[in-house]
């Protein structure tokens, strides 16, 4: 193999790695897990591997595509924040027009597969992408701290879409699961915005801490945590979870509530970071419980 050929392979692998990082694989993976859990919560034939594969591919591509498009749109403000300055989009490591094309291609293929599988499922997947890219990132993120609500709606769509795919319609359990995600997202994102408050201020991005103060932000986290835990337990009961699984979900929810109370009355960097990490563990564990219970 010639030196130029070897260099080409290395460059190709490097670019693939860059684009993989732009999809935020951990975040995208968590949202994908909610979609799969939503589908399985419908107690449909979960071992229909064709449907599961289609759901996995369509959701991941749509989520990854929207994330790449967000990176493309936010490249100017990312360049002003210390934690995001080294992203490929903000550092100029990749061509911005190429990033746009990749984001659009991933999004179109993902939504296209979803629509081909089921019209309602495809509509919900598209709605999640639209709320994330257009409503949240392009329209509201630089204008209001309440943009996280609309970002939360986007994050709630995968689980609603997954359950709708399994049932063929939207029911109250699917809506409750989606509300659990919607209320969980402020717990996750507001702790993050508190930690990086100066970064967001440098980029002139309005956040709850900069707009309403830390006290109101902590109170919002506490309220959203209570609502998220309540919604998940109610949805679990509606699904028909065994009492053993419900008790486990209750224990997980109690942990979330304890940290939310701690950050309200005894705030510290340690508690803030602990809640940020636990929020992700809580949601992933809740989704795993749903999947295990119905199998």
Predicted regions mapped to residue ranges:
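Short, basic, low-complexity termini and linkers enriched in Ser/Thr/Gly/Pro
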Residues: 1-16
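The first (N-terminal) embedded transmembrane alpha-helix
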Residues: 22-41, 156
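Hydrophobic alpha-helical transmembrane segments in multi-pass integral membrane proteins
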Residues: 160-170, 228-235, 283-295
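Solvent-exposed interhelical
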Residues: 67-105, 109-110, 183-239
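Membrane-embedded alpha-helical segments that form the functional core of polytopic membrane enzymes
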Residues: 33-37, 41-75, 82-83, 107, ...
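Transmembrane helix-loop-helix
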Residues: 101-144, 221-278
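Transmembrane alpha-helical segments that form the membrane-embedded catalytic/substrate-channel core
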Residues: 61-68, 131-137, 179-197, 229, ...
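Interhelical loop and helix-boundary elements at the membrane-water interface
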Residues: 17-27, 88-99, 135-154, 207-219, ...
């Amino acid at each position: 193999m010639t030196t130029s050929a070897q260099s080409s392979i290395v460059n190709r692998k490097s670019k693939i790695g860059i684009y993989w990082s732009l999809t935020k694989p951990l975040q995208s993976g968590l949202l994908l897990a909610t979609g799969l859990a939503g589908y399985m919560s419908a107690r449909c034939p979960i071992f229909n591997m064709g449907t599961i594969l289609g759901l996995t591919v369509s959701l991941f591509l749509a989520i990854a595509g929207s994330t790449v498009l967000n990176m493309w749109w936010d490249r100017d403000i990312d360049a002003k924040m210390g934690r995001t300055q080294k992203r490929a989009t903000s550092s100029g490591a990749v061509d911005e027009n190429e990033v746009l094309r990749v984001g659009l291609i991933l999004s179109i293929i993902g939504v296209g597969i979803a629509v081909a599988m089921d019209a309602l499922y495809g509509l919900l997947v598209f709605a999640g992408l639209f709320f994330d890219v257009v409503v949240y990132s392009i329209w509201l993120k630089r204008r209001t701290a309440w943009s996280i609500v609309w970002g939360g709606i986007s994050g709630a769509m995968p689980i609603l879409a997954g359950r709708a795919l399994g049932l063929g319609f939207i029911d109250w359990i699917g809506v409750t699961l989606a509300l659990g995600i919607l209320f969980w997202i402020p717990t996750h994102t507001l702790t993050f915005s508190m930690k990086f408050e100066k970064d967001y201020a440098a980029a002139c991005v309005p956040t709850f801490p900069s707009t309403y103060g830390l006290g109101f932000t902590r109170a919002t986290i506490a309220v959203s945590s209570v609502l998220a835990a309540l919604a998940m337990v109610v949805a679990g009961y509606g699904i028909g979870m065994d009492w053993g699984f419900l008790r486990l979900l209750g224990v997980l929810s109690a942990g979330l509530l304890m940290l939310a109370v701690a950050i309200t009355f005894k705030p510290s960097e340690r508690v803030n970071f602990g809640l940020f990490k636990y929020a992700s563990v809580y949601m992933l564990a809740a989704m795993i419980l749903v999947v295990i219970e119905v199998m």
